[in-house]
Curated annotation (Swiss-Prot):
The keyword Hydrolase applies. One of its GO terms (molecular function) is hydrolase activity. Its EC number is 3.1.7.12. It comes from Herpetosiphon aurantiacus (strain ATCC 23779 / DSM 785 / 114-95). Belongs to the diterpene synthase family. This is (+)-kolavelool synthase. Transmembrane segments: none annotated. Involved in the biosynthesis of (+)-O-methylkolavelool. Catalyzes the biosynthesis of (+)-kolavelool from (+)-kolavenyl diphosphate via the release of the diphosphate moiety through the nucleophilic addition of a water molecule. It catalyses: (+)-kolavenyl diphosphate + H2O = (+)-kolavelool + diphosphate.
Length: 289
């Protein structure tokens, strides 16, 4: 059994080492891209904003796949976005997604990076159905890293997908149900990286693919995640959270060495308001001891 590397060693390790501990399936749900545009003194409307944000997203995708992710699920449109009344937003979002996911430039980009890409929509849309069809390429192979863009228009839609699959296909196991919905076997997601408030709902998570999900929330808006930050997440995921033991005989006594931490421990999830936004309270106890 290999010794656990230090964080410093992991941050500088070759990609081949990192890929050995990365989960097969991950969900990435960013947010705050309009907030990031405001911080960059840019209008969060129009093509300039869409292209600017899109380039940052692509850097994140390259980061995740280069570190060993095999199936990356990316919620692009969610129910609250279809309910917005922001001028010049709702009427353009489908065109933005179609362009961002399946333009000719993007098809060439995927081929250059050897990615397979799918677009899932919970309801029929001519714009996105056409984009999904364009993503089906003759060179596609199940062994390629796969990007799954998905759109959820109504909070009931994920359930309807399961019910409809059950009506069309006879399945008796979860694995069979997954294959009926997605067209292939996919390992359950073990890593969820999101933004803002630490909350999860079924709109963000692909149906039937929630495994032992380890969750992380960045507070930097937009598609802003550096390689160092993602490696910190993977280090915590792969090493620090692996605390379960078959025999817990001596485990409980180890808590005595950290009595003040357990007796004065913080509540994760408490926050404060920064103008109209939520931001987490500090949870560091070491400075108080």
């Amino acid at each position: 059994m290999r010794p656990t590397p230090t964080l410093a060693e992991f941050l500088h390790a070759p990609l081949t080492t990192i890929r050995q501990v990365a989960p097969a399936t991950m969900v990435f749900s960013s947010g705050g891209s309009r907030r990031k545009a405001a911080l960059a003194n840019m209008s969060a409307a129009g093509e300039e904003y869409a292209r600017w944000s899109h380039q940052q997203l692509l850097k994140c995708l390259e980061l995740f796949f280069s570190h060993g992710i095999k199936h990356l699920f990316l919620p692009m449109l969610l129910p609250n976005q279809f309910q917005e009344t922001t001028p010049n937003y709702r009427e353009h979002i489908e065109q933005w997604v179609a362009w961002g996911a399946a333009s000719q430039t993007m098809l060439e980009y995927y081929q250059e990076h050897n990615w397979r890409v799918r677009l899932l929509d919970t309801q029929y849309s001519p714009i996105l159905a056409d984009a999904a069809q364009r993503l089906q390429q003759p060179y596609d192979h199940p062994d390629q890293p796969t990007l799954w863009w998905f759109v959820v228009r109504d909070s009931e839609d994920p359930w309807q997908i399961i019910f409809q699959a059950a009506q069309k296909t006879v399945f008796k196991t979860r694995s069979q149900a997954i294959e009926a919905i997605y067209g292939e076997p996919i390992p359950p997601a073990e890593l969820f990286v999101s933004f803002g408030k630490p909350q999860v709902n079924h709109d963000l998570l692909p149906p039937l693919l929630v495994g032992e999900l380890q969750c992380y929330w960045t507070q930097k808006p937009g598609y802003t995640l550096s390689e160092e930050e993602f490696r910190q997440i993977l280090y915590d995921f792969a090493f620090l959270r692996k605390t379960w033991q078959v025999d817990k005989t001596e485990r409980t006594q180890a808590a005595l060495a950290f009595r003040q931490h357990w007796e004065r421990g913080p509540i994760l999830g408490l926050g404060q308001q920064l103008g109209p936004f939520w931001y987490p309270q500090s949870t560091s106890i070491e400075s108080e001891l």
